[in-house]
Amino acid sequence: METQRYLYETHMHTSEASACAGSTGAQMARAYKEAGYTGIIVTDHFFYGNTSVDRSLPWEEWVRRFCLGYEHAKAEGERIGLSVFFGWEACYEGTEFLVYGLDQA
C-alpha cells in the first residue's frame, strides 16, 4: 500500500497585505508548489498587525485590499494545482494569533 504525503504551509504572508513579505500571493503559490507542497494558508497580518494596507481607508476598501494576496494566491493555486486557504494573523496586546476557518465576508 502506497502512502500519500500531504504538506501544507500554515502561516504565510504576501506582499499585497503584509509589510514583512517580499513576494506576491501568486509568487508564493508557485514557490510552494515547486517545493512540493500540497497547499498553503495565507495568513497576512490583520488590521493591528504588520499590515501594508493603509489603515485610513474605508473599512470595505481596507478588507478588499487585505484579501488581494489570498485572491492572487488562490487564482494561481487553481491554475497550478495547489490548495489555497484563507486565514489571517491577528495581534492582541503584543501576542499574535493565527485565525483559520472564516471567510472574507
Where are these regions (language model features)?
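A metal-dependent hydrolase metal-coordination microenvironment
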Residues: 2-105
